[in-house]
Regions:
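A short, exposed loop/beta-hairpin motif centered on an aromatic-Gly-Thr core
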Residues: 21-41
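Short aromatic-glycine-(Arg/Gly/Cys) micro-motifs in beta-strand/loop hairpins
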Residues: 2-28
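Mixed-charge, low-complexity intrinsically disordered regions enriched for alternating acidic
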Residues: 38, 43, 63-67
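Short amphipathic, charge-patterned alpha-helical segments
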Residues: 42-54
Length: 97
């Protein structure tokens, strides 16, 4: 019996009245699958890995924090946060701090 779980993630950015779209100039960079056999490495864990990678890239590029959301599904990509196992939204500081 396999205990592996596939966690599929996607990073989206707001796109005005059209809603959300895949993040960045290379959206495939921010879409993928993490396979884990450790029950502690759940959807929230995968989202934390992706957020850490995003923030590291922003620092490397000297870019400001951006408004994005990280969506994680179990086994297969869904349509949005409504069918996700976990979703976190990052919003930039609007007060400049």
């Amino acid at each position: 019996m396999s205990t592996e779980t596939d966690w599929v993630y996607r990073v989206d950015e707001p796109h005005g009245s059209e809603g959300w779209r895949p993040y960045g100039d290379q959206p495939e960079r921010w879409r993928g699958t993490v396979t884990s056999d450790d029950p502690k490495e759940d959807a929230e864990y995968v989202a934390a890995l992706v957020v850490t990678d995003l923030v590291s890239e922003w620092y490397r590029q000297g870019a400001a924090q951006r408004h994005v959301r990280v969506i994680v599904w179990q086994d297969a990509e869904g349509t949005g946060p409504e069918d996700a196992a976990f979703m976190v939204e990052i919003q930039p500081h609007i007060d400049g701090e």
